[in-house]
Amino acid sequence: MLGVRALFGIGLLVTSRGGFVLTHTRACSSAASNIYSKHLTHRPTCTMANTGVKYLGQEEAQQIDEELFSDFSFSVDQLMELAGLSCATAVAKGYPVTSLLKSPARVLVICGPGNNGGDGLVCARHLKLFGYEPSVLYPKRPNKQLFQNLSIQCQKMEIPFLTEMPEADLIDEAYSLVVDAIFGFSFKGAVREPFGEILSQLKKITVPIASVDIPSGWDVEKGCPDGIQPDMLISLTAPKKSAALFKGRFHFLGGRFVPPVLEQKYQLNLPQYPGTECVFQLN
């Protein structure tokens, strides 16, 4: 095992094993741009899109997921792979390797105990293939073969796993970006440790945060004004209602797997993805 500072030339232990419709067009947030500009050599182009995509409540989002698994015979790992690839693609579009001041382009991927965490593991693997240097923090690993397999895949690609959450100043020093894959749309109730402390540290960092589906700690429908404020949100399947409160620079839609009949049933009004793209920028 190595220390994070030793691994990155700076010390933490790591192991290499181990519904309503909203139509909006909004300019990229200048405040967010100022906060994160010191981590970029240039600001990526912000492509605007005007779309009337439907924003989902928690119950409706769960119903769509259940139908994908039951009526349409998708498997969990199948959708997880598509979702994780979408997340990595969105990150690559918003924060190209060549735009980051730090080299190599290190990304901290923080994974929760559920499917959102699985999306994060897939995202980390694809980020590695895209030329980034991801590290994974996975403090509560489920005892399920699917998640064990995803962890092994990362380990085989020499993606290090941290043993504890770095302090905010160390994250700012070592990383260019944090991917928040802790809690998804099914999250309810109070945040339990160690995730409470993790979210506390994330609120202190200055490097950009890219949240998967929901900013962790947010109410799926009401948001959380005192919670983390990501620079990027990657909504999966369709945005959730809390996404209307997102104030970051990049809002992407990912998970290009919704059958047309299901889209019509729930009146999702999904945008037309260009060409073979697996993500679509909503703001």
Curated annotation (Swiss-Prot):
UniProt KW GTP-binding keyword: no
Top EC group: isomerase
Function statement: Catalyzes the epimerization of the S- and R-forms of NAD(P)HX, a damaged form of NAD(P)H that is a result of enzymatic or heat-dependent hydration. This is a prerequisite for the S-specific NAD(P)H-hydrate dehydratase to allow the repair of both epimers of NAD(P)HX.
Protein name per its UniProtKB record: NAD(P)H-hydrate epimerase
Primary subcellular site in the record, as a coarse category: mitochondrion
Subunit text: Homodimer. Interacts with apoa1a. Binds to high-density lipoprotein.
One MF annotation (Gene Ontology) recorded for this entry: NAD(P)HX epimerase activity
Disulfide feature: none
Positions of (6S)-NADPHX binding: 115-119, 184-190, 213
NCBIfam families attached to this UniProt entry: yjeF_nterm (TIGR00197)
Cofactor note: Binds 1 potassium ion per subunit.
Keyword Isomerase appears in the UniProt entry: yes
Upper lineage: Eukaryota, Metazoa, Chordata, Craniata, Vertebrata
Boundaries of every YjeF N-terminal domain copy: 61-270
Location of the transit peptide in the chain: 1-28
Chain positions recorded as K(+) binding sites: 116, 180, 216
